[in-house]
Amino acid sequence: MTKISDLPRDLAEEVLSRVPVTYLRAIRFTCKKWNTLTKRRSFTKKLIGQEKAEAKVKEFHAIMTLNSRLHLMSVNLDGIHKDENVESSIKQKGKLISLTVADPDRIVISQVYHCDGLLLCITNEINSRLVVWNPYSGQTRWIEPRTSYREWDIYALGYESKNNAKRSYKILRYLDAYEDMGDMSVEPRTRVCEFEIYSLDTNSWKVIEVTTDWDLCFLHRGVTLKGNTYWFAREKIPPPPRERVIEDIPLGEAEINVEIPSFLLCFDFTIEKFGSRLPLPFRPCVDDTITLSSVREEKLAVLYQRWDITWTGIWISNKIEPNAVSWSKLFFPMGRIRPLEAASGTFFVDEENKLVVLFDKGESILNPTRNTAYIVGEDGYIKPVDLGESVHKYCFPLACSYVPSSVQI
């Protein structure tokens, strides 16, 4: 009697390439032959090709942070306007657990960044830790700090494109804080800005010199596109004197929602420098919400919501480079949705079906207890999809598109 493990290699590859990524780890432990097969370049190429084909036709995968745990989700928006059963359009495929630790459920993830099938995860601990992870292969690399990691550090994962087409993966760490944050009596306040780069090739950190006339906010997540990371940034504004902060400002002297020059910035991992300021297709005020996303890892999308939630819309780039950007017409203005936080509002754009999937909390603003995905379309179309209970009011669901990768770390 023929066993499934005795199938010809080509047929076994065809069968196993259709298995969800979350089950590949279990398959590798099933038999030595399958463990070897799933690590072959031909199998990985077939698996990645199938993932990309599904993404173009109807379904794509996403990595989502739900309640500080990582999950693999499938998103299928094909024919969504005709089907009121929107709950079936977003499904949880499984929890990602291959962090090569004794008890992966004890690893609490506060931030996650995606690049080329790799994830950079930051743990939520008193002393944060960094780990680069390939969920497909199960490989991990825990990154030791040069000094120590801080709660408000900003990170990015990207790669340097070399002449031989080999990609050299790197981490950018940006510390922007006041040395005396714990002692409010200190005057003047000493601000520290420091940039470090970690190379996965050399397994080492180095400090780079960057002169900034702009601010990156910890809550505004960067998006990596073609190996480079883009952020929403604002012109640097000097802090007011301490006594000015604590005294009452005369009525009418303070503006309710001021406009500060805002733009995009790109960090080029090949030359290890920031590019020039890139224009936005709108002029935001301080209390407005801006979040970024990628479209099939080829275009940049930006979501803008006015502070009074009277208007929300998305633009998509038709050209994006470290020193140049041009924007296509507005994708569409959305219907009235709940106020978004800078720490939330991750989203996907489906250009073909003219739909957006926006991840946030439930409709209750004062006591949001449910993680929710909103499927938003033209002419005011909006449908919520419940993603389960939220264990913490300020723990938002965060998502990024995902295609398996054979990258070795």
From Swiss-Prot:
Family matches, as SUPFAM superfamilies: F-box domain (SSF81383), Galactose oxidase, central domain (SSF50965)
PROSITE patterns cross-referenced by the UniProt entry: FBOX
Residue ranges annotated for the F-box domain, each copy included: 1-47
Family matches, as Pfam families: F-box, FBA_1
Organism domain of life: Eukaryota
SMART domains, A to Z: FBOX
Name the record gives this protein: F-box protein At3g17320
Annotated organism of origin: Arabidopsis thaliana (Mouse-ear cress)
